[in-house]
Amino acid sequence: MFKPGKTYDAIVVGTGAAGGWAAKELSEKGMEILVLEAGKQLNPAKDFTNHAQPYNMKYRGFDRPGERELTYPNQWTASEYSKQLYIKDAEHPYITPKGKPFRWVRSRFVGGKLLHWGRNARRMNDFHFRAADHDGYGENWPIRYAEMAPYYDKVESFVGVASEKVNLPHWPDGKYLPPMALNCGEKIIQKIAPKVGMRVATKRAAMRTKSIHGLGKCHYCGACGNGCDAGAFWN
């Protein structure tokens, strides 16, 4: 909590993926941090609907006719289940250059879009860092994968990323929790893929398949975009 007259070592603006991690690292080094967030703290028990069924929703999950167009037209991943995790476009308008529309998905809450993100946690590789060498466009990054690897290790160990090692240069392996179990359709694809020269691997998902650091694990309810009251993915 902000204390008038107190001197802070650093101010972090925003509590999403970047701001939240910056505050964690700086405070763990003994620094006094002030974190500024434009939104409120949500209550998972009240604001998350990952276990809600259509009959729990007033409009069976489809929302009141015309509500999306009037209130949150740019929040394309929002629904009657999850609109409380997003801003209302009508209250926070913005403009874009003519002929260059942009749909800006925003969440003004503690945690930001980490409350409902896609949890895709792939590592970049040297094809990314040296892209200009391959396609001649732009500039290469001033860093290489080998320099980033230890930091990927640190983040994955803390966050909890479920996947499997595949030993592919364009898809670097990391420190993983057990992979998410495949469903029936995925198992069929995994079986036939080698026959056409392909292979199937599980997504690198920041989803805990077992409990670490005293946090929850996934129980496969499937409605991750509506917030996770089990605390099974990083936010």
Predicted regions and their residues:
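Glycine-rich FAD pyrophosphate-binding loop
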Residues: 27-49
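Glycine-rich, histidine-containing beta strand-loop boundary motifs that form or position
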Residues: 15, 37-40, 44, 119, ...
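Conserved redox-cofactor binding core of oxidoreductases
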Residues: 59-62, 66-88, 93-103, 108-109, ...
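N-terminal Rossmann-like FAD-binding beta1-loop-alpha1 element of flavoenzymes
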Residues: 10-35
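Flexible, glycine-rich phosphate/dinucleotide-binding loops
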Residues: 19, 42, 209
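A short, basic/flexible loop-to-alpha-helix module at the beginning of a structural domain
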Residues: 1-7
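Acidic, Ser/Thr-rich peripheral helices and adjacent loops at domain boundaries
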Residues: 48-64
